[in-house]
Amino acid sequence: MMKKRIVFVLLSTLLIATSCNNNDDTVLPSATFKVTVENVFMPKAFQSNGVFDAIPPGSSQSFSFNAGKGSYVSLATMFVKSNDLFYGFSDTGLALYDTNGDAITGDVTMHISLWDAGTEVNQEPGTGSNQPMNQSGPNTGDDENGTIHLVNDNFMYPSKESVIKVSLTHDGGTLFTVTIENLSNTATLATPLAPGVWAVHNDQTKLFTDGTTASAGMEKLAEDGDNSMMNGFLMNNSGYFSPFAPGVYAVHAATVKPIFTNNSSDIGNGLEALAEDGDPSALASSLMSTNGIVTSGVFNTPDGASNPGPLLPTNTYSFTITAQEGDYISIATMLVQSNDLFYAFDDSGIALFTNGNPISGDVTSSLTLWDAGTEINEYPGAGNNQPVRGGAMSGMDENGIVHVVNDGFMYPATAEAIKVTITLQ
């Protein structure tokens, strides 16, 4: 009997010990991560650019472009029966909107001038042996070694109004069309206008600068009517780029969609303010009280800066998180030169552990450019209701759903815009 009791006690003790072990919480792997968001856009001096063909007397050429408030257009076309003269607006270009924000339209020839590139000694208009229609080849005249200036060489030139007419049409939205007419078939000196270039830019950028030496591209355009080098320069320095706005992050359970749900309407948690105006505050506040979120916060101060601000090209935001196996991370940051677009992972975020191992490396391929569906999209970088020009809550409501952007406009590849790296600490 005593032996049976001893055996019973030993078995009971073993069962209790086993039971206690089964009730212990399993310790999941955890890790600390540094998340870095980098703006990898290449800054561009010009918003857009293009070329137009030669314009014989009695004919015309047109080109169109999108431009928002604060934009200017510049152009240059050679006065062919000269050594190095070209027509263009002032070096600051032509403002496309007036001080009231209304589009400028109509005949803008009054803003056109005949410029001397200062690169070749002038000869009498139409008769000079070193002018394109008379010379044996390009670049044959005597170097002037001067600077760009309004023509003032004591030769007689036909009035600009008898040679060229430039008209500006506003086609709705932010679309404009420029038409250049060659009227010189009835002038005292009929002349072709050579193939030219145009560019859209802000008030800090110039196609050329009065009083300075002409670029090699401007020299070829003004002396030989060859726009290829100037066009190459403009193509390399034109295009879309954008800051990113302060954003939010959340570490959460796999079943949680903390920021948005694909193909569903915005739930009013603050995504609209983030995606339209770059304001993460409402969304950050909402995340703090959302079930299934381990931790959340705002990234808003570029690394090396002392104050919050937008993320400009070559700069980074960074923040540190601690998570355990099973946790996911979501982020969102506005593409500022848009109406309501933002970069984020899928609506469920991405896992911070794979097979029990913490991830580390470039996760940019998991990012997508999303449309919040809250404001009607305008031409990227030119919309007058985008934050740079319109201010908060200025666009037309879309009343749509959150979806991968698909609006017919062209956007850069994700890897050309943003880079997100998660580094194990």
What are these regions (language model features)?
Residues 29-105, 173-175, 184-347:
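Structured domain cores in non-transmembrane regions
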Residues 1-2:
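N-terminal secretory signal peptides that target proteins for export/translocation
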Residues 58-60, 68-171, 301-425:
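Mature, soluble, non-transmembrane domains
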Residues 13, 17-32:
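Bacterial Sec-dependent N-terminal signal peptides
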Residues 180:
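Active-site-proximal cofactor/substrate-binding loop regions of enzyme domains
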Residues 5-15:
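Sec-dependent N-terminal signal peptides
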